[in-house]
Amino acid sequence: MAKSAKELKSMTLKEFEKAAEQFDNDDPSVYNMCRKDYPDILAELEKEEFTDVLDAGCGTGAVIALLAEKYPGKHYTGIDLSPKMIEVASAKKTENAVFVCGDCENLPFEDNSFDAITCSMSFHHYPHPVDFFRSCGRVLRPGGRLIIRDMTAGPIKLKLINAVEIPLVHLLGKGDVACYGRKDFERFCRESGLKLELFEQRKGFRLHSVMRKSV
């Protein structure tokens, strides 16, 4: 039986509340593997000037800590569903950074607040991906970018993941929702008003994508 959005968010919250204290540990866990995405996120962000950045699904604030070290004087905001993740992120006292507990599908920020939004290995936990895209479009400034790193695969592999692997993951108590392909992202953009500028499948089934708000 398919899980409801409420159930999936509850499972995700439970998973990451439990993981918060060990998320930054140097163990060979799936969380440690997520760090391999950070250089590509920074490289993409660096292609254009920015002042205000939002990291959606920020976890313990690792991406923001890297950005703040490399680009001091900018303004950084992180949002995550897990209060304990936000607690750990805030305890790092990263300069010019604020961390907020909230739902990425309904971002609690003013319109036109950010030059760019990053989202690393969090998007597959969102039950309503179009709501996330629309919320990002609202808080991005004209011409602003949404940069997503996640998992993807070819059409046959994606069907297998979503039909078999995701339900198995639910049995382990994890709230993964789905993995997506290019056609999915094209639809998300059509329904949210964003423009898909880049969609790549990189090594390790990694999705690297860039969406832009019109000027």
Per-range role (PLM):
Residues 130-142:
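A short glycine-rich, Lys/Arg-flanked "PGG" loop and its adjoining helix->strand segment in the class I
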Residues 118:
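A conserved beta-strand element that flanks and buttresses the S-adenosyl-L-methionine
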Residues 7-8, 26-30, 63, 147-192, ...:
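C-terminal alpha-helical "lid/dimerization" subdomain adjacent to the S-adenosyl-L-methionine
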Residues 50, 114-115:
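Local beta-strand N-terminus motif with an aromatic residue
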Residues 54-56, 60-106:
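Class I SAM-dependent methyltransferase SAM/SAH-binding core
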Residues 210-215:
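C-terminal lobe and adjacent flexible extensions of AdoMet/dcAdoMet transferase-like proteins
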Residues 2-47, 62-66, 88, 164:
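Conserved class I S-adenosyl-L-methionine
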Residues 121-122:
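Short catalytic micro-motifs in class I SAM-dependent methyltransferases
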